[in-house]
Regions:
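N-terminal helix-turn-helix
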Residues: 1-81, 256-257
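An N-terminal domain-start capping segment
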Residues: 5-31, 96, 102-126, 248-258
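A structural microfeature
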Residues: 57, 118-120, 227
């Protein structure tokens, strides 16, 4: 493990990282003045840094709203990281198979710094579908993907991730404590046991009415969940949910290993 020496500082680098971390918390972005205010810096201080980050394609300026947003460059860089690259290569064929079988979109998520990060997505072959955008982040306990990832960890690692989750929720500046308190109480040892027993979670979405999420883990060599594959299932008039669930169970998805 690399020991971090706290007696060194790099103010310009810290400024750039502060901007990137701030922009990661908003889907609509921030104006230059808002960034300066949030980071407690002057507009002049951040002007050059914003230009450099834009030139390097880490951020982009929406000329209509004059707000800065993150680009997908960080996601692209992370996808080139060998473990993530391997995970994507092994998962995508299974995801395509499931999408074809049940006519629904499928997305792949991992745990990242106290939150859930969507790193891959396969569209439904149908002419219409509900899908989750690659690069999206969510509260771990608001999603079936997050709960599955938490369930298939050691107790120590599960608690560590829940602590990091609290920090993520606070950084998001949520106005109510529903996510922080109620959802954590509902995520009981009984729920964990049921997910482990079933090797998946099938549950109505907490975010979208009419959607039932089917989430399954992908294991690493230690039998811990390294990722989760989720099908946001929309009930259709001409399809039977139980039949589609049975079809999914015939694939290699429930025994996937990275």
């Amino acid at each position: 493990m690399i020991k971090v020496k706290k007696n060194y500082s790099a103010p310009a680098l810290e400024k750039g990282l502060d901007i990137i971390e701030l922009l990661s918390k908003s889907s609509i972005g921030f104006s230059q003045a808002e960034i300066a205010k949030e980071l407690n810096r002057s507009v002049n201080e951040i002007y050059r840094m914003l230009n450099i980050l834009a030139l390097r394609n880490y951020i982009e300026l929406d000329e209509d709203t004059e707000r800065y947003k993150l680009t997908f460059k960080l996601l692209q860089l992370s996808s080139q990281h060998q473990p993530v690259k391997n995970l994507m290569q092994k998962s995508l064929p299974m995801m395509r198979e499931v999408a074809q079988l049940c006519n629904h979109s499928v997305h792949l998520s991992i745990y990242y710094a106290g939150k859930l990060l969507v790193i891959g997505q396969v569209d439904s072959p149908s002419s219409f579908n509900y899908s989750v955008k690659t690069g999206s982040t969510f509260d771990l306990l608001e999603t079936s993907s997050g709960r599955v990832l938490l369930a298939f960890q050691t107790e120590e690692e599960r608690q560590r991730r829940l602590i990091r989750r609290k920090l993520f929720i606070k950084l998001q500046k949520k106005k109510n404590n529903l996510s922080l308190n109620i959802l954590e109480k509902k995520f009981s040892s009984k729920i964990v046991h049921e997910i482990i027993k079933n090797k998946c979670e099938v549950v109505k979405s907490l975010q979208i009415d009419g959607v039932t999420n089917i989430s399954v883990p992908i294991f690493d060599h230690t039998s811990q969940a390294i990722a989760a594959v989720t099908i946001p299932f929309l009930q259709r008039i001409n399809r039977n949910f139980q039949n589609d669930l049975s079809l999914i169970k015939t694939t290699n998805l429930l025994k996937a290993q990275a």
